[in-house]
Regions:
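Gram-negative host-targeted secretion-system effectors, predominantly Type III and Type IV
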Residues: 143-147
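Membrane-embedded catalytic cores of phosphoryl/pyrophosphoryl-handling enzymes
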Residues: 26-34, 38-135
Length: 147
């Protein structure tokens, strides 16, 4: 449910920014700042990277996923410049605005998940016993977060 809401917000954010800034593209009459392609891809692949980081995949596979996400965003950003569809600042603005929006959304989702977990019976405090091989150890209070 997060992805559709996030991408719909990305489209709205890009339209508002283009309307507010009203800067034309290099060779076109349409608005150019920020680059909608870059903004959308930063949000989408940034979310994929965030989800990948919390996955149970082996580290080499996660790094392959990170590299694929980064390469896609960079390739599209370069293509926007190469095709003279945007100025460098349009692409940088799309990247910056997309990253800010993504970080805000991740913070919001994590905050809501923590609140929901704290309100549920499974989110109560639990005691964890940490012990070494010989049975020596200590009790540690921790909060169990169920997402």
């Amino acid at each position: 449910m997060v992805l559709p809401l996030l991408m719909a917000g990305t489209g709205a954010l890009q339209l508002v920014a283009k309307w507010a800034i009203d800067r034309p593209r290099p060779n076109l009459a349409a608005w150019g700042f920020p680059s909608g392609h870059v903004l959308s891809l930063v949000v989408f692949f940034g979310l994929m990277t965030y989800l990948l980081a919390s996955s149970t995949l082996a580290r080499p596979r996660r790094w392959l996923g990170y590299a694929g996400c980064a390469a896609t965003v960079l390739a599209v950003a370069f293509s926007r410049l190469y095709l003279e569809a945007h100025w460098v600042t349009d692409v940088a603005g799309g990247f910056t605005l997309g990253l800010a929006y993504l970080l805000l959304a991740i913070c919001l989702v994590e905050t809501l998940a923590r609140r929901r977990a704290a309100a549920s019976p499974q989110g109560s405090e639990a005691q964890v016993h940490l012990a070494d091989d010989e049975g020596r150890g200590a009790d540690v209070d921790s909060v169990v977060v169920a997402v």
